[in-house]
Amino acid sequence: MEAEVINQLNNTLNDLEKRSEDIRVYMDYQGKKDRLEEVIGLSEDPELWNDPKRAQEIGKERKILEGIVLTLDNIATGIEDNRMLIEMTVEENDEEGFAAVQEDVAGLEKQMADLEFKRMFNQPADPNNCFIDITAGAGGTEAEDWAGMLFRMYSRYAERKGFKIEILEEDDGEIAGINRATIRVEGEYAYGLLRTETGVHRLVRYSPFDSNNKRHTSFASVFVYPEIDDSIEIEINPADLRIDTYRASGAGGQHINKTDSAVRITHEPTGIVVQCQNDRSQHANKAAAMEMLKSKLYELEMRKRNEEKQALEEGKSDVGWGSQIRSYVLDSSRIKDLRTGYEVGNTKAVLDGDLDGFIEASLKQGV
């Protein structure tokens, strides 16, 4: 074993120790550890399960806290253990054992990188589930097909992350794709990961719907907003709501059109409209639509609060509904984020849900 390799491994452990100390301060390790002990106590109380919703919230909080506290504990233990193992394997000239130490240290680096990535989740709702609204722009079939491609892209991304998805509303295009859709994404940090996808997505390709095989440009809008729980109070005056029922359209089985089970709620002071047609029950669809409305009102309030701050940040683009954020040029095999400059050539992989590079770049640059 070369001295340079041994020194490099020891330096890696020293670097990990310093990064671990920094992130313990930044993430308030002791505060989270104390809270984890409280949450474990709450979760072991048999009476908690009399309130399933509260039990679910406690379970979610416990998982998030354990992901930070136990990972930092594991890294600290791993650093000390591997320092001793380096000494032992060097003394015994145990190359196989030394290789195992190198592999274990690489695993610790991966855990640290994952924690450092979570530092970028700095909004209160980042750990929450989220909703994604996808709407085709002008252009008929071309735009509707593009909206359908985005629908699939985000569905595949969610599957890759092990998230659950639920289609709450889907309006099929006349020939292909969708006119609009809303999906719910359930998973740890779903909103934090996906929130920077809000904006207008532009597609340039040779159209499969054009017999002359001309190049077409299509647009679709994406809006991501967090699912909020009872810890965030959103007051809604029933007098501000207009509630309409209608027969659902789109995918969902033959039963979906037999009754007026779909629900549309309009919040008249803001003009926000939410729709749900996922369930046979009008009552269930109304409840789901109300949750979507609460989430949209929360997102609207958060955007208002951040408006002044964003205006002062030089070079920071407006990520509102009307802003173009990403260009997908398929015939040139190029997808580029217009805010961060991040670009890839494997268009097929991106449209199949490989969005990690784009999301990491946008979070690091704070778009």
From Swiss-Prot:
Modified residues (N5-methylglutamine): Q254
Keyword annotations from UniProtKB, A to Z: Cytoplasm, Methylation, Protein biosynthesis
Subcellular location per the Swiss-Prot or TrEMBL entry: Cytoplasm
Modification after translation: Methylated by PrmC. Methylation increases the termination efficiency of RF2.
Gene Ontology CC: cytoplasm
Transferase among keywords: no
Superkingdom, taxonomy of origin: Bacteria
Pfam families, A to Z: PCRF (PF03462), RF-1 (PF00472)
GO molecular function: translation release factor activity, codon specific
Keyword Mitochondrion tagged: no
Membership in a protein family: Belongs to the prokaryotic/mitochondrial release factor family.
Protein purpose: Peptide chain release factor 2 directs the termination of translation in response to the peptide chain termination codons UGA and UAA.
The protein's name in its UniProt record: Peptide chain release factor 2
